[in-house]
Amino acid sequence: MRYHRRMDYQAKLKVPFGVLGIRCTGDAVTGIDFLPAGEKPRRATSAFAETVCAQLLHYLENPDAQFSVPLELNGTPHRQKVWQAMLAIPRGQTRSYGELASELKSCAQAVGQACGANPIPVIVPCHRVVGKAGLGGFMKHASGDPLDIKRWLLAHEHAIPSPLAGEGQGRGG
């Protein structure tokens, strides 16, 4: 899993699938990390971080909640395009790596790599990008806890296609 231990987090938020480490500048979210089991939640250290946490908690209660916090997404031009395309996928829907690649005139593997490099998962919904015949990957893994988190997020949004509900194989993001 993409776990980080020694980051300077502005908050550590308890969520149904673990603890999220929230990184932000004064006025933009720069990262969300899935923290290792046993990590303790920590209150937000700024008003902006409190807003980020409140919006995440609101989304976790109501999948139709909208995020309005500014994001600072740093990456290659291709990754930027993929992340923007993911932000355009409506809640309750998914796109395959191939479909997104076709829209962006790219290839499925490059889309999967951009999904895996997404610095702000949950808000930038890489979980909505799935394999052609399965869930695909999540956090650079194709099985285990990361796929359980992806499955949880998709089920929460009522987006998980029933053939994929128990599926854990795939590639990419």
Which residues does each PLM region occupy?
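Nucleic acid-binding interface residues in structured DNA/RNA-binding domains
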Residues: Y9-P16, A65-L164
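Low-complexity, small/basic-enriched stretches
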Residues: M1-F67, K132-A165, G172-G173
